Amino acid sequence: MKDMAQEKTAGMSVIVPFLNEEDGIGLFCETIDEYVKTLIFPIELVFVNDGSTDRTEEILKGYRFEHVEKARLISLSKNYGSHAAIRAGLTQAGYDICTWIGSDLQEPLELIPEGYQKIREGYDVVYIEKETIQVSKANRTFSKIYSRLVQKYAVSSYSSGGISTIVFNGKIKEMLNNNIESNSSIMLQIMDAGFRCITIPMNFHERATGQSKWTMKKKIKLFIDSFVAFSFAPIRLVTIIGGVLFAAGIVIGLIAIINKLINPAVPTGYSTLVCILALGFGVTNISLGIVAEYLWRAYDAARGRPCFIIAEKKDLTTAE
């Protein structure tokens, strides 16, 4: 039993989720296969096809790794999103020490040995922080706003610099596999759990090929998921706004009564009434939407539907 436990911690499983990366998957495989030669421990690659519709899977199945100890392909039944794809990969990971990287080669591969070393030193979690990367002004602004809001209202331990990936040990892996959350952030779930951690800043690279699949729609969903799943701030905000509007309504009503008593000839404020009603109904609908987000996620969790469905598994290190 002890030998088996030591064997599981003697290497690292690297989860690689991808979506329509036919232009760059070959370069990624060549690069990481060559890099593995510099490592003193084995790694296992777990590729997760998150509903690709191009030739990425076909190219991957045709590639033959020379230095990677084990590589496997997990194909999901449809596109579930990168966080669900990572969770799917973790359920199939053979080693206790795990991480995930993108197939676009933006993450430095040096995070693999450095993260592994920190885990062997006794840390449970190693956060890889983006230090330098060329991104658009809009993406940089979104990242800063997201980081600050999450740090203040959801998970206080979240790095203001932004975390791209995480290296973690078997305790975290077991926790994630036993608590597979849908409509959630896997990074915030790890941070929210605590454990002994360390942050390593690293220089990231520009995307080698193709275009990013990280669309604004997906960013907005992550933003909503992060707060609804890990913070009561939206509900508290609704309560505060409701209290402020209630107080404002009383003040406006008193002012109207006093004005009428002082000067009966003062006309009734039709435009003021319309503005107040429009504001009130607008806030009410927004509040209902926020509450509905919580209710929907609670209902979705209660149904117990799977966060992902694995359609196919294939060993890429076994010749056909």
In which residue ranges do the predicted regions lie?
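Acceptor/aglycone-binding surface of glycosyltransferases and processive sugar-polymer synthases
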Residues: 74-78, 82-92, 97, 109-184, ...
